[in-house]
UniProtKB/Swiss-Prot annotation:
Name by which UniProt lists this protein: Mannosyl-3-phosphoglycerate phosphatase
Predominant cellular place of this UniProt entry's protein: cytoplasm
Source species: Aeropyrum pernix (strain ATCC 700893 / DSM 11879 / JCM 9820 / NBRC 100138 / K1)
Gene, per the UniProt record: mngB
E.C. number: 3.1.3.70
Pathway note: Carbohydrate biosynthesis; 2-(alpha-D-mannosyl)-D-glycerate biosynthesis; 2-(alpha-D-mannosyl)-D-glycerate from GDP-alpha-D-mannose (MPG route): step 2/2
Reaction catalysed by this enzyme: 2-O-(alpha-D-mannosyl)-3-phosphoglycerate + H2O = (2R)-2-O-(alpha-D-mannosyl)-glycerate + phosphate
Record-linked InterPro entries: HAD-like_sf, HAD-SF-IIB-MPGP, HAD-SF_hydro_IIB, HAD_sf, MPG_Pase, MPG_Pase_thermophiles
CDD domains on file: HAD_Pase
Amino acid sequence: MEARPCSGVIFTDLDNTLVGPGGEAGEAGEVYLEALDLGYRVVPVTSKSIYEIVELWDSIGVPPGERIALAESGGAIYGPRGSLARPTGFNSEVGLEYTALGKPLASIDALLDSLAETCGAVRLSKADATEAQLITGLPRERAALAARREYLEVIWSRSQECLDTILSTALRYRELTYVHRAPRTVQIAAHRGKGMAIDAALQEPLLRPCAKVVVTAGDSSHDIPIIERGMLAFRVDYNRDWSRLVKPIYMVIPYEAPKAWTMLIETVKTRSNTPSL
């Protein structure tokens, strides 16, 4: 697949950055398509599974040739057939080839089981429909898509003490290279996370021509590896903890999604007409 002329690339978080709390893109969906028309490639970088991302793309109407994503917090890069330099395989269900950027959950399955069993926690990848809804807070069908994990496990418990125990135990294992504590879960994987995934993606033939302008956006401290890689970086800010943000150069968007992403594209359009960008 030949890379089309490219104005730049936008690496963006999804939840609370491009899509609102209900999981809908709304007006941001139209702006997503506008960004494509402007010559940008838009690459979601998210903890979501590829099946959730494809559902979002379908709802927006993203063309098949523009479907590129870093799924499960950087576990794999997905793109159209023929777009990746050294694909690991082809997912016929979603019609995309992929390159694994770490080990699949199957390779650390026993270890993940032992962590969850420490205090009766639940693995999202093994959750039933009711548990998946409880863990994700999503409607039943979307929760089922979220549970289809291949590279990032989400372990849930009602007990904060349980989650703290799982976190401290997981950090002792060298093979678990991605361990993050969220308010209600612990996310665990055998890959290097969002930032390293972006670095790898920019080496792909599909995105290499876009690297002259790299735009990034995120809404939480977990998105710092995304934000810090942007030449034009956006922080969707509403009472978030940004104490770990090292890179001081970013623009604050004082709106929630999906309006936040609309403002992002308007700013990109304005800045793209200046010599500095």
